[in-house]
Amino acid sequence: MNVVQGNIESKNAKVAIVVSRFNSFVVDSLLNGAVDTLKRFGQVADENITVVKVPGAVELPLAARRVAACGKFDGIIALGAVIRGGTPHFDFVAGECNKGLAQVALEFDIPVSFGVLTTDTIEQAIERSGTKAGNKGGEAALGLLEMVNVLQALEEQL
């Protein structure tokens, strides 16, 4: 039986991190967690990490698509924070962001790691950006590193 799986270390990986500026007090912590994880666990060099900042979560898929289309990156991490308010706006933003990022991954055959928080409260977002519930930016980076290696292993074995 052949089992294909990836590891975390990926020294030569070129990674783009597409980041929403909206709710920056949360998203900046996600970005720090992602970059720290890429460097410490993935051994990714500074020069192989590119950060692209966009206004909000709705803009993440378009920026990710442009990054994927250039063909210079092995993977993309999308980071943002969508916090529920008193209107249905949350559902539209969160859903379209998720759907758009998944479409980019499938269209361009590139891993796109979803590090966009979708929470009911500001407190939940803060907990998930480096306090009680860990750092979801770091978790998104770990997932991306593994998928970069899984796809490389598949290419070699299939």
Swiss-Prot record:
One GO cellular component term noted in the UniProt record for this chain: cytosol
Active site: H89 (proton donor)
A GO biological-process term: riboflavin biosynthetic process
Superkingdom, natural source: Bacteria
GO MF entries: 6,7-dimethyl-8-ribityllumazine synthase activity
Pathway this chain belongs to: Cofactor biosynthesis; riboflavin biosynthesis; riboflavin from 2-hydroxy-3-oxobutyl phosphate and 5-amino-6-(D-ribitylamino)uracil: step 1/2
Gene3D superfamilies: Lumazine/riboflavin synthase (3.40.50.960)
UniProt xrefs under SUPFAM superfamilies: Lumazine synthase
Residues that bind (2S)-2-hydroxy-3-oxobutyl phosphate: G86, T87, R128
InterPro entries: LS (IPR034964), LS/RS (IPR002180), LS/RS_sf (IPR036467)
Keywords recorded for this protein, A-Z: Riboflavin biosynthesis, Transferase
Assembly and interaction partners: Forms an icosahedral capsid composed of 60 subunits, arranged as a dodecamer of pentamers.
Family label: Belongs to the DMRL synthase family.
Primary role: Catalyzes the formation of 6,7-dimethyl-8-ribityllumazine by condensation of 5-amino-6-(D-ribitylamino)uracil with 3,4-dihydroxy-2-butanone 4-phosphate. This is the penultimate step in the biosynthesis of riboflavin.
NCBIfam families, per database record: lumazine-synth (TIGR00114), PRK00061.1-4 (NF000812)
Protein name per Swiss-Prot or TrEMBL: 6,7-dimethyl-8-ribityllumazine synthase
Gene source species: Shewanella halifaxensis (strain HAW-EB4)
